[in-house]
Amino acid sequence: MNGIKNIKFIKWSNLIKLKIKKKIFYWAPFLTPIATPKAVINSAYSLQKYSNEFDCSIINFFGEFNIFKKDIVNKNIKIYNSSFNILRKYLPFKGKIKSRFSFLIIFILSFLPLRKLLSEERPDYLIVQLITSLPMFLVLIFNFNTKFILRISGIPRVSFFRKLLWKIALKKFYLITCPTESTMQYIKSLNIVDDDKIKVLFDPIIEVKKIKSETNKKNNTISHNNYCLAVGRLTKQKNFIFLCKAFKKVVTKYPNAKLLIAGDGEDKEKIDSYIIKNKLEENIITLGYIKNIFPLMYGAKLFILSSLWEDPGFVLIEASFCRTPTLTSNCETGPIELIKDKKNG
């Protein structure tokens, strides 16, 4: 009976607090600021904010997430850095051939470190979003206790080799998620994985407080009125040359029409050259990368998305949240599920 006095009773609430959280790692190396890293950060933040069951970490292999470090730290998301943390400064990223070369370097250098990290840290889940071939090879060659989840956005080009790799590797994946219904149906049509493994999972995009705060900040370096706005990487996907050609026709009818293009990328010289050649410098203005786009987005008379494909199109959702009228191309995925003609765009 005396021994009973020494027993310490623990409340159920304390037991819940002591519950071991499931570890989720994100693998999404990128070369240029695109929508995916924002999706990664928002996903990790949302899981930790709205659930006590998960502990999220982002793998920052070659310093790609350094530009988001402040945001990641503020959201209490862990970062796993590698010894190649400053490699991003030296990797070429403009141009298809140069970027492919950089991805090959990343694949080779990260093969063993990623295997070691997964073996030592033993995360419950690894969410794979970019350079997906590396985790696929790892899961084929080695055995992990980690459940691999593949995130597929857009309509990926499926060569014979890629289709073969996916068909073999995805048998060992736990889940495949897509941000839109269209993409999910496309992946199902490839017959590379059981339909039961493929799910639609919408990206957490809108941070209401942040957008309202950013919108109220003034950008002293940019001052424009009565303008249309387009935002995105200056690449083939965003189709800005087509947009410039279309806007040229608008200018012939409305000489004071103005289009601002915010973004940077491999097609910048081509776009600038077209603008100069057609004497549109007063009508079409390239701004470069704008860190806080919301004041411009909020002030635009019209937001234009000219992309060849999107999934789902983050900027389109953000523009809609800012109550800015939208005009979008009819992409295979994304906009067609977001915009109803003559209702919200």
Which residue ranges define each predicted feature?
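Aromatic "clamp/platform" in nucleotide-sugar-dependent glycosyltransferases that forms part
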Residues: 289, 308
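Short His-centered aromatic/hydrophobic patch
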Residues: 107-110, 128-134, 152
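N-terminal strand-loop element at the rim of the active site
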Residues: 12, 27-34, 46, 50-101
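Short hydrophobic beta-strand element within catalytic cores of glycosyltransferases
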Residues: 325-329
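Acidic anion/phosphate-binding donor-loop and adjacent secondary structure
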Residues: 160-161, 185-189, 202-224, 295
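A short, active-site helix/loop in glycosyltransferases that binds the activated sugar's phosphate group
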Residues: 173-198, 205-207
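Short beta-strand->alpha-helix junction loop in the catalytic core
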Residues: 155-156, 183, 201-212, 233, ...
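A conserved mid-protein helix/loop that constitutes part of the nucleotide-sugar donor-binding site
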Residues: 37-42, 226-249, 259, 266-272, ...
